[in-house]
Curated annotation (Swiss-Prot):
It is an enzyme of class 5 (isomerase). Keywords: Carbohydrate metabolism, Cytoplasm, Isomerase, Metal-binding, Zinc. PROSITE patterns: SIS (PS51464). This is Phosphoheptose isomerase. The lineage of its organism: Bacteria, Pseudomonadati, Chlorobiota, Chlorobiia, Chlorobiales.
Protein backbone atom coordinates (compact mmCIF):
# COMPACT_ATOMS: atom_id res chain seq x y z
CA UNK A 1 0.00 0.00 0.00
CA UNK A 2 1.40 3.38 -1.00
CA UNK A 3 1.88 5.85 1.84
CA UNK A 4 0.00 9.11 1.38
CA UNK A 5 2.09 12.11 0.49
CA UNK A 6 2.30 14.84 3.09
CA UNK A 7 2.82 12.54 6.09
CA UNK A 8 5.09 14.29 8.55
CA UNK A 9 6.98 11.19 9.61
CA UNK A 10 8.13 8.02 7.92
CA UNK A 11 7.29 4.55 9.15
CA UNK A 12 10.63 4.31 10.94
CA UNK A 13 10.56 7.72 12.61
CA UNK A 14 10.06 6.26 16.08
CA UNK A 15 10.70 9.43 18.07
CA UNK A 16 7.98 11.38 16.24
CA UNK A 17 5.38 8.71 16.94
CA UNK A 18 6.44 8.43 20.56
CA UNK A 19 5.74 12.16 20.88
CA UNK A 20 2.23 11.51 19.57
CA UNK A 21 1.76 8.92 22.32
CA UNK A 22 3.00 11.29 25.02
CA UNK A 23 1.03 14.28 23.76
CA UNK A 24 -2.21 12.30 23.49
CA UNK A 25 -1.97 10.56 26.84
CA UNK A 26 -0.84 13.61 28.77
CA UNK A 27 -3.51 15.87 27.25
CA UNK A 28 -6.17 13.28 28.09
CA UNK A 29 -4.88 13.10 31.67
CA UNK A 30 -4.88 16.89 32.07
CA UNK A 31 -8.39 17.14 30.68
CA UNK A 32 -9.63 14.50 33.11
CA UNK A 33 -8.00 16.37 35.98
CA UNK A 34 -9.73 19.59 34.92
CA UNK A 35 -13.09 17.81 34.79
CA UNK A 36 -12.53 16.12 38.16
CA UNK A 37 -11.54 19.30 39.98
CA UNK A 38 -14.46 21.27 38.58
CA UNK A 39 -17.20 18.65 38.83
CA UNK A 40 -16.59 16.30 41.75
CA UNK A 41 -19.66 17.49 43.66
CA UNK A 42 -21.87 17.11 40.59
CA UNK A 43 -20.58 13.60 39.93
CA UNK A 44 -21.38 12.62 43.53
CA UNK A 45 -24.87 14.11 43.13
CA UNK A 46 -25.38 12.11 39.92
CA UNK A 47 -24.39 8.90 41.65
CA UNK A 48 -26.66 9.67 44.60
CA UNK A 49 -29.60 10.24 42.24
CA UNK A 50 -28.96 6.97 40.40
CA UNK A 51 -28.62 5.03 43.65
CA UNK A 52 -31.87 6.53 44.90
CA UNK A 53 -33.69 5.52 41.73
CA UNK A 54 -32.42 1.94 42.02
CA UNK A 55 -33.34 1.74 45.70
CA UNK A 56 -36.93 2.82 44.99
CA UNK A 57 -37.45 0.29 42.20
CA UNK A 58 -36.75 2.57 39.25
CA UNK A 59 -34.41 2.04 36.33
CA UNK A 60 -31.75 3.91 34.41
CA UNK A 61 -32.05 4.43 30.65
CA UNK A 62 -28.98 5.55 28.67
CA UNK A 63 -28.71 6.88 25.12
CA UNK A 64 -26.16 8.37 22.75
CA UNK A 65 -24.94 8.18 19.15
CA UNK A 66 -21.85 6.59 17.62
CA UNK A 67 -19.09 6.30 20.21
CA UNK A 68 -21.54 7.56 22.81
CA UNK A 69 -23.86 4.67 21.90
CA UNK A 70 -20.98 2.31 22.62
CA UNK A 71 -20.40 4.06 25.95
CA UNK A 72 -24.11 3.74 26.77
CA UNK A 73 -23.93 -0.02 26.22
CA UNK A 74 -20.65 -0.28 28.13
CA UNK A 75 -22.04 1.44 31.22
CA UNK A 76 -25.41 -0.33 31.13
CA UNK A 77 -23.62 -3.67 31.02
CA UNK A 78 -21.48 -2.81 34.03
CA UNK A 79 -24.58 -1.86 36.01
CA UNK A 80 -26.49 -5.01 35.06
CA UNK A 81 -23.69 -7.58 35.09
CA UNK A 82 -20.92 -6.11 37.21
CA UNK A 83 -18.27 -3.41 37.27
CA UNK A 84 -15.40 -4.92 39.27
CA UNK A 85 -15.03 -8.60 40.03
CA UNK A 86 -14.18 -7.82 43.66
CA UNK A 87 -17.65 -6.34 44.30
CA UNK A 88 -20.54 -8.78 44.58
CA UNK A 89 -24.03 -7.33 44.34
CA UNK A 90 -27.40 -7.89 42.65
CA UNK A 91 -27.93 -6.77 39.07
CA UNK A 92 -28.93 -3.12 38.76
CA UNK A 93 -31.57 -2.19 36.14
CA UNK A 94 -29.83 -0.11 33.46
CA UNK A 95 -30.90 -0.24 29.81
CA UNK A 96 -28.97 1.13 26.83
CA UNK A 97 -31.47 2.39 24.23
CA UNK A 98 -28.88 1.83 21.51
CA UNK A 99 -28.88 -1.95 21.11
CA UNK A 100 -32.05 -2.94 19.23
CA UNK A 101 -31.28 -2.49 15.53
CA UNK A 102 -34.87 -3.29 14.52
CA UNK A 103 -36.34 -0.63 16.81
CA UNK A 104 -33.71 1.95 15.85
CA UNK A 105 -34.08 1.44 12.11
CA UNK A 106 -37.88 1.31 12.28
CA UNK A 107 -37.92 4.51 14.30
CA UNK A 108 -35.52 6.23 11.93
CA UNK A 109 -37.49 5.10 8.89
CA UNK A 110 -41.01 5.74 10.20
CA UNK A 111 -40.56 8.67 12.58
CA UNK A 112 -37.21 10.22 11.65
CA UNK A 113 -33.88 9.61 13.35
CA UNK A 114 -34.35 12.51 15.76
CA UNK A 115 -37.23 10.57 17.35
CA UNK A 116 -35.63 7.14 17.85
CA UNK A 117 -34.59 7.53 21.50
CA UNK A 118 -37.65 9.58 22.42
CA UNK A 119 -39.88 6.75 21.22
CA UNK A 120 -37.94 4.20 23.27
CA UNK A 121 -38.15 6.43 26.36
CA UNK A 122 -41.90 6.56 25.76
CA UNK A 123 -41.96 2.75 25.66
CA UNK A 124 -39.71 1.95 28.61
CA UNK A 125 -39.55 5.03 30.81
CA UNK A 126 -41.87 5.61 33.74
CA UNK A 127 -42.21 8.45 36.26
CA UNK A 128 -39.42 8.05 38.78
CA UNK A 129 -37.02 6.52 36.26
CA UNK A 130 -33.85 8.23 35.14
CA UNK A 131 -32.47 9.03 31.67
CA UNK A 132 -28.76 9.61 31.05
CA UNK A 133 -27.87 11.24 27.73
CA UNK A 134 -24.36 11.18 26.26
CA UNK A 135 -23.30 13.70 23.62
CA UNK A 136 -19.83 15.02 22.82
CA UNK A 137 -21.34 18.16 21.30
CA UNK A 138 -24.29 18.60 23.63
CA UNK A 139 -26.53 19.05 20.60
CA UNK A 140 -27.40 15.55 19.35
CA UNK A 141 -31.02 16.04 18.36
CA UNK A 142 -32.06 12.46 19.06
CA UNK A 143 -30.73 12.82 22.61
CA UNK A 144 -32.24 16.31 22.99
CA UNK A 145 -35.69 15.00 22.07
CA UNK A 146 -35.33 12.06 24.46
CA UNK A 147 -34.36 14.21 27.45
CA UNK A 148 -37.07 16.74 26.67
CA UNK A 149 -39.70 13.97 26.62
CA UNK A 150 -38.36 12.43 29.83
CA UNK A 151 -38.52 15.74 31.70
CA UNK A 152 -42.11 16.28 30.63
CA UNK A 153 -43.15 12.80 31.78
CA UNK A 154 -41.88 12.61 35.34
CA UNK A 155 -38.36 11.32 34.78
CA UNK A 156 -35.14 12.84 36.09
CA UNK A 157 -32.39 13.56 33.57
CA UNK A 158 -28.59 13.46 33.56
CA UNK A 159 -26.09 14.29 30.82
CA UNK A 160 -22.40 13.82 30.05
CA UNK A 161 -21.50 16.44 27.47
CA UNK A 162 -18.66 18.19 25.65
CA UNK A 163 -17.85 21.63 24.27
CA UNK A 164 -20.01 24.23 26.00
CA UNK A 165 -22.75 21.72 26.85
CA UNK A 166 -25.03 22.75 24.00
CA UNK A 167 -28.80 22.38 24.19
CA UNK A 168 -28.64 19.36 26.47
CA UNK A 169 -27.10 21.28 29.35
CA UNK A 170 -30.39 23.08 29.85
CA UNK A 171 -32.44 19.87 29.70
CA UNK A 172 -30.50 17.88 32.29
CA UNK A 173 -31.15 18.08 36.02
CA UNK A 174 -27.44 17.42 36.45
CA UNK A 175 -24.70 17.52 33.83
CA UNK A 176 -20.94 17.35 33.45
CA UNK A 177 -19.43 19.23 30.52
CA UNK A 178 -15.97 18.24 29.28
CA UNK A 179 -14.44 21.56 28.15
CA UNK A 180 -12.98 20.34 24.87
CA UNK A 181 -14.06 21.63 21.46
CA UNK A 182 -11.84 19.51 19.24
CA UNK A 183 -12.31 15.91 18.21
CA UNK A 184 -14.83 13.75 20.03
CA UNK A 185 -12.32 11.16 21.22
CA UNK A 186 -10.92 13.22 24.09
CA UNK A 187 -14.45 13.94 25.35
CA UNK A 188 -15.43 10.27 25.11
CA UNK A 189 -12.35 9.28 27.13
CA UNK A 190 -13.57 11.53 29.92
CA UNK A 191 -17.14 10.27 29.62
CA UNK A 192 -16.24 6.61 30.08
CA UNK A 193 -14.03 7.45 33.05
CA UNK A 194 -16.85 9.50 34.59
CA UNK A 195 -19.19 6.58 34.00
CA UNK A 196 -16.86 4.21 35.80
CA UNK A 197 -16.51 6.58 38.76
CA UNK A 198 -20.29 6.95 38.94
CA UNK A 199 -20.78 3.17 39.02
CA UNK A 200 -18.19 2.87 41.78
CA UNK A 201 -19.97 5.57 43.79
CA UNK A 202 -23.40 4.03 43.26
CA UNK A 203 -22.16 0.68 44.55
CA UNK A 204 -20.66 2.33 47.62
CA UNK A 205 -23.81 4.37 48.30
CA UNK A 206 -25.96 1.25 48.08
CA UNK A 207 -23.77 -0.57 50.58
CA UNK A 208 -21.77 -2.66 48.13
CA UNK A 209 -18.07 -2.51 47.50
CA UNK A 210 -17.00 -2.20 51.13
CA UNK A 211 -14.43 -4.57 52.60
CA UNK A 212 -17.05 -6.00 54.96
CA UNK A 213 -19.50 -6.64 52.14
CA UNK A 214 -16.83 -8.29 50.00
CA UNK A 215 -15.80 -10.64 52.80
CA UNK A 216 -19.41 -11.64 53.38
CA UNK A 217 -19.97 -12.39 49.70
CA UNK A 218 -16.71 -14.04 48.71
CA UNK A 219 -17.98 -17.61 48.78
CA UNK A 220 -19.60 -18.87 45.61
CA UNK A 221 -18.13 -16.23 43.29
CA UNK A 222 -15.37 -16.89 40.78
CA UNK A 223 -13.00 -14.06 39.96
CA UNK A 224 -13.38 -13.51 36.23
CA UNK A 225 -11.71 -11.04 33.90
CA UNK A 226 -12.56 -9.80 30.41
Amino acid sequence: MRRKSGCSAGLDDRSAYEEVVLDSMLYSARLKETVARGNSAVVVAMARLIAGVFETGGKLLICGNGGSAADAQHLATEFTIRYRSSVHRPALPAIALTTDSSALTAGANDLGYDEVFRRLVEAYGRPGDLLLGLSTSGNSRSVVHALDYARKHGMRTLALLGGDGGALKGLADLSVVVPHNGSADRVQECHITLGHVIIDLVERMMGYGTECNNQQNEQGYADQTD
